Amino acid sequence: MEAVELARKLQEEATCSICLDYFTDPVMTTCGHNFCRACIQLSWEKARGKKGRRKRKGSFPCPECREMSPQRNLLPNRLLTKVAEMAQQHPGLQKQDLCQEHHEPLKLFCQKDQSPICVVCRESREHRLHRVLPAEEAVQGYKLKLEEDMEYLREQITRTGNLQAREEQSLAEWQGKVKERRERIVLEFEKMNLYLVEEEQRLLQALETEEEETASRLRESVACLDRQGHSLELLLLQLEERSTQGPLQMLQDMKEPLSRKNNVSVQCPEVAPPTRPRTVCRVPGQIEVLRGFLEDVVPDATSAYPYLLLYESRQRRYLGSSPEGSGFCSKDRFVAYPCAVGQTAFSSGRHYWEVGMNITGDALWALGVCRDNVSRKDRVPKCPENGFWVVQLSKGTKYLSTFSALTPVMLMEPPSHMGIFLDFEAGEVSFYSVSDGSHLHTYSQATFPGPLQPFFCLGAPKSGQMVISTVTMWVKG
């Protein structure tokens, strides 16, 4: 107890009575009291502003004893500076160990206010009715609680670390999978590019072989005809020479030249030259790429030919001829041909749609695009000059008619499933056989004067059906 009391007394001696904190740059007045230099100067600054006269100019009252002390006579107390430093460093003399109000040790703990108090505070009106514990007992309880909280936090830190490690592992695995997929994409495209190059070379080689075979036959025909021409020219010269001879000379031995003339006959080529190469332009995977621009094309019932019936079945939209007809002819309706257009007009971008044909007999059909203001009342040729970019075919034939090629496109088989691709900005309309992926025809470098609509045409009533859909599905039986 004597050590505690001694420590308390030492703490009191090292404490400034103005700020109630350990001395900072302590100074001593002429009356022998000590204060922090900043505290005494602030106190005197306040006193200077108060009314009344001081007994001596430049003197101020001591905050402890009120004795007047000249300001210039403040003396530094270096010994007290050392004492204050020792008190601050001593673990038993920390400022928080004493009550700031009563300067008594904080030996108790108020549970309601959750703060340490001294014995004087315990008897005060503020804490008299509160539950108070000895500080050591409260410390033990809080130590247990802090240990529980720290253990919980340690568990959470461990859990967080495990989660972080798991997420880092997931991140690394994800990046590894993405890297593997990226490498796979690059590899597959390299393989596809190599395959496309090889396929291109194969098609070009086949086309070159076909060109050489046909050209060889044609060259042989040219050479044969050239030989026949020379023989005919030689015979003509002989006959012209004989015709200029005298009568007796002309009549001599006429049997031989006349017999040669009678034996002359021009031999025509045995095989007619093909109108188009047999080698088909077929790019693997092109249809799948074009389907990235797939449109859900819906035929417009308000403008369709009166004898066309539009109906849906299982998400498919069918365009088929109907002999009954609607009997209603608006100004926008096709009346010259069994035609219809799509509801949506395209004025930019790339668009692709597919049409299946279930055509009967030798009916004529046509597919493509047309201007949104084409003539619908008159029978006009379906050519670009009239606003049509279409291909057409009579079922049973193998020649697809176009209006930009001098000769029709020869087909191995009439297509039953067509794909139409419009690139508005490029001025191109391309046609494909979806069944085998072959390219059939392209209108290129076209100048479209306005919006374009998908165009469908059946040659006559009872000619069959067109299946217009974005997805073709069937169940294998």
UniProtKB/Swiss-Prot annotation:
It comes from Homo sapiens (Human). It comes from the Eukaryota. Interacts (via coiled coil) with TRIM44 (via coiled coil). Interacts with TRIM28; this interaction prevents TRIM28 activity on BCL2A1. Interacts with TRIM41; this interaction prevents TRIM41 activity on ZSCAN2. Interacts with BECN1. Interacts with NFATC3 and NFATC4; these interactions prevent NFATC3 and NFATC4 nuclear localization. Pfam families: SPRY (PF00622), zf-B_box (PF00643), zf-RING_UBOX (PF13445). This is E3 ubiquitin-protein ligase TRIM17. It is found in: Cytoplasm; Lysosome. Residues 277-475 form the B30.2/SPRY domain. A zinc finger (RING-type) spans 16-66.
